[in-house]
UniProtKB/Swiss-Prot annotation:
Belongs to the xylopin-like family. GO terms for biological process: defense response to bacterium; defense response to fungus; innate immune response; killing of cells of another organism. It is found in: Secreted; Target cell membrane. The keyword Membrane applies. This is Antimicrobial peptide Xac-3. One of its GO terms (cellular component) is other organism cell membrane. Keywords: Antibiotic, Antimicrobial, Fungicide, Immunity, Innate immunity, Membrane, Secreted, Target cell membrane, Target membrane. It comes from Xylocopa violacea (Violet carpenter bee).
Amino acid sequence: GVLSLLKKLPMILKHLHGK
């Protein structure tokens, strides 16, 4: 659900900034 997406957002942002 939305909560799952919100929890994944920080990880995705870290992955993008990790580049």
